[in-house]
């Protein structure tokens, strides 16, 4: 019989619903508890999905929980994942792994040191389209790829997200939040980047998040 991993979720915000909806299709892990710095959010989530509500410290100390799902805001991914690894648990984090490259490398090194697994979204490159493209490239059916181009445009996170404020803070924004989907796909198809450059533009100095 396959082992069923007991998972604790930290961060009961907007994206948590997607994970709860999707995890019912898997038989090798089960979300059994949730935590949030906003205790009311954790209690609401626990009631909705019939699981335990805990504090962050409680969920990290629970010996029955082997894996933590880190769904906090991007600015907190590094600190929360580090606490999880130091608590002796495996961690899967929403993207990005960290908002700074060196901190991401530190987490990977810490996981190796403690012989724990660390995983990170996005997993969308494993979808049918991405895998078919990789198959065509790896088989040399379409020749050597010289250029990859990915474009993402939408009216703004404030149009759908209940709490978009973190997008407008330091270490937030579309490159950090949405960029990983496209960077991950391009790296998976074409290999690691040898050189990176960037350019930004601020269209409006003042934005209204909610009216």
Feature names for model-found ranges:
Residues 1-49:
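N-terminal Rossmann-like dinucleotide-binding module
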Residues 33, 66-67, 147:
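Short, Asp-centered acidic motifs that coordinate Mg2+ and/or phosphate
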Residues 54, 92, 117-119, 149, ...:
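Structural detector of well-ordered beta-strand residues that form the stable sheet scaffold
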Residues 71-72, 152:
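Glycine-rich, N-terminal phosphate-binding loop of Rossmann-like dinucleotide-binding domains
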Residues 66-67, 73-74, 78-125, 140:
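Beta-strand-loop-alpha-helix segment that lines the small-molecule cofactor/substrate pocket
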Residues 50-58:
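Conserved SAM-binding strand-loop segment of SAM-dependent methyltransferases
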Residues 124-208:
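Predominantly a Rossmann-like dinucleotide-binding segment in NAD(P)-dependent oxidoreductases
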């Amino acid at each position: 019989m396959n082992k069923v991993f007991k998972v604790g979720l930290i961060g009961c915000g907007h994206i948590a619903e997607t994970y709860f909806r999707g995890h019912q299709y898997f038989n090798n892990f089960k979300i059994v508890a949730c935590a949030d710095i906003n205790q009311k959010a954790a209690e609401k989530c626990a009631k909705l999905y019939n699981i335990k509500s805990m504090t962050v410290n409680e969920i990290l100390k629970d010996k029955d929980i082997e894996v933590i799902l880190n769904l906090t805001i991007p600015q907190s991914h590094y600190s929360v994942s580090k606490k999880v690894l130091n608590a002796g648990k495996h961690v899967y984090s929403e993207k990005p792994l960290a908002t700074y490259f060196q901190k991401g490398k530190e987490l990977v090194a810490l996981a190796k040191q403690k012989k724990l697994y660390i995983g990170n979204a996005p997993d969308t490159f494993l979808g049918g389209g991405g895998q078919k493209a990789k198959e065509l490239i790896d088989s040399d059916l379409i020749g050597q790829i010289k250029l990859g181009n990915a474009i993402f445009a939408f009216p703004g996170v404030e149009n759908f997200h209940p709490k978009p404020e973190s997008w407008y803070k330091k270490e937030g924004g579309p490159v950090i939040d949405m960029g990983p989907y496209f960077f991950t796909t391009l790296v998976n198809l074409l290999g690691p980047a040898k050189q990176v450059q960037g350019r930004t533009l601020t269209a409006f100095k003042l934005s209204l998040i909610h009216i």
